[in-house]
Amino acid sequence: MSDKRRYFGTDGVRGKVGQYPITPDFVLKLGWAAGRVLAKQGTKKVIIGKDTRISGYMLESALEAGLAAAGLKATFTGPMPTPAVAYLTQTFRAEAGIVISASHNPYYDNGIKFFSSEGTKLPDDIELAIEAELDKDIECVESAELGKATRLNDAAGRYIEFCKSTFPSDLSLANVKIVVDCAHGATYHIAPNVFKELGADVVAMGVEPNGTNINAEVGATDVRALQKRVVEEQAHLGLAFDGDGDRIIMVDHLGNKIDGDQIAYIIARDALRRGELKGGVVGTLMTNLGMENGLKQLGIPFVRAAVGDRYVMEQLLAKGWKIGAENSGHVILLDKVTTGDAIVAALQVLASVVGSEMTLHDLSQGMTLYPQVLENVRFVGNSNPLEAQAVLDSVAAVEAELGDKGRVLLRKSGTEPLIRVMVEGEDAELVQSSALKIAEAVKASC
């Protein structure tokens, strides 16, 4: 079997709705192919959640039809954060969990991603087996063996209680005012309740999904509205989740953005303070040098993985460590969850705020972020701009100018047709001009 994936990217199957492969007929067949493979594994039970995109209804029906044709039973949770589906898959002893979401992407995109029975991303061999089944014609099981669909009405309540259980029982969020931005996404009916039930004064925004407003000028990918609201409300801090609840970006009381690197640093330092840190921290190639240096000053080991929470997880498991993060807001805490969980990560930072009696702003000052600029260049076709001589020359020139006081990273996005150009260094103006220079070279080579 070839290890070359045709459909599965770094985070499942994703694309624009109505365009292959995110079409009703393909998703039906994907459900059947997954069902064929999963039926050989055990219970024939699958948990299905989704975010708030209007296309979720269509894709949910197609997916369930395919699973039923393969003889699997589907349990629907309705709109539910990705990490909640991972949790429910474990607690219900299901063979797999499936999430219909395109995470932080616009509403017109959608995707399908799978979790194993342990609540982790599917192993490579299972994904490849599913792709192999997609080459076959659909064969329906006998009528008596067809799968049924049921709905889990208390899914939200179960997950809310789990999230609360990860917050120290001797602490409370009483007298803490929090602005919670749910991006009109899957956390809209969950996150505000978690923090309210722990005692916080919650101001909720991004909690009116209409099918087309997910991630639209709100949430973890655009915190400007949250920054303004935190200052207006004189809140202690703000929390921004992405559309499917696996990314968290925070805002301090002054309106400053606190990214995934800073969040992981705060959590690791607090674990060290309490004598509970197990190993070090895993970041990615995009992790800010400031985080690496900040951890080094504390004597906390740090390694970089490839970009993508899948690769952060691989490094965590290989090293036996518990804390991993991407600066985009994926934070994985393996002593509490099996995948990136934005609500749980936020609760650990809040525990540090309350337990240390320090502000989020003060906690974030332990590390100094280097100026970092990210330029995204859209490309089409099968060409590889990263191999163009003009791009290579541009990168070499910038690296020579930065010397040992900065770095350059170019990579293809695993979820979108983008080339990501990242430049980081001590000199903000040089970093900005260098990123634009390389981005122009990439555009000219596309």
Swiss-Prot record:
UniProt KW Lipid biosynthesis keyword: no
Cofactor(s), names only, from the UniProt record: Mg(2+)
GO molecular function, one term: magnesium ion binding
Designated name of the protein: Phosphoglucosamine mutase
Known catalytic reactions: alpha-D-glucosamine 1-phosphate = D-glucosamine 6-phosphate
Residues of the active site: 103 (phosphoserine intermediate)
Keywords: Isomerase, Magnesium, Metal-binding, Phosphoprotein
Enzyme Commission number(s) from the entry: 5.4.2.10
Domain of life, source organism: Bacteria
UniProt binding sites for Mg(2+): 103, 242, 244, 246
PTM statement from Swiss-Prot or TrEMBL: Activated by phosphorylation.
InterPro entries: A-D-PHexomutase_a/b/a-I, A-D-PHexomutase_a/b/a-I/II/III, A-D-PHexomutase_a/b/a-II, A-D-PHexomutase_a/b/a-III, A-D-PHexomutase_C, A-D-PHexomutase_C_sf, A-D-PHexomutase_CS, Alpha-D-phosphohexomutase_SF
Entries under Gene3D superfamilies matching the protein: Alpha-D-Glucose-1,6-Bisphosphate, subunit A, domain 3 (3.40.120.10), Alpha-D-phosphohexomutase, C-terminal domain (3.30.310.50)
SUPFAM superfamilies: Phosphoglucomutase, C-terminal domain, Phosphoglucomutase, first 3 domains
